[in-house]
């Protein structure tokens, strides 16, 4: 098992108001860089104790939270967590969160495709120790804006 990460934040509209009831989904590879996907090579080596995905409805204040693993790199990609948000009004956003300052980000084709540094900041997780959680756990807060 990898390092525990507590990922939380809010789903907001373009005016900064919370989006109630948005469906938030995340998925990622395990601590060995293996996805739970039928076409994933090396799938027999996957950590069967790690689900690899989660989904929840954002609360009235737009809040969501997941207990997952700190993402790891795999061939051609820097550490990241995929996410998708669907709102009751039909808005859909699919993107990825990256670890801020990760040296591999500059070699990741998807990350490099985001040329505006201000937009990159919106998807860069700042990881910090998670006080009051399990020993060694990390935490980050990532608000998601859908418009």
Task: Please give the residue ranges for each predicted region.
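Beta-strand-dominated extracellular/periplasmic modules and repeats
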Residues: 1-147
């Amino acid at each position: 098992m990898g390092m525990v990460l507590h990922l939380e934040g809010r789903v907001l509209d373009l005016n900064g108001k919370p989006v109630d009831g948005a469906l938030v989904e995340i998925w990622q590879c395990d601590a060995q860089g293996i996805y739970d996907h039928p076409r994933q090579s090396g799938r027999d080596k996957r950590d069967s104790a790690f689900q690899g995905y989660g989904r929840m409805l954002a609360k009235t204040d737009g809040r969501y939270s997941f207990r997952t693993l700190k993402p790891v790199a795999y061939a051609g990609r820097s550490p990241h967590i995929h996410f998708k948000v669907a709102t009751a009004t039909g808005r859909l956003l699919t993107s990825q969160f990256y670890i801020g300052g990760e040296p591999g980000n500059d070699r990741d084709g998807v990350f490099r495709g985001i040329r505006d540094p201000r937009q990159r900041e919106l998807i860069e997780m700042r990881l910090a120790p998670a006080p009051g959680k399990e020993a060694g756990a990390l935490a980050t807060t990532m608000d998601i804006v859908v418009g």
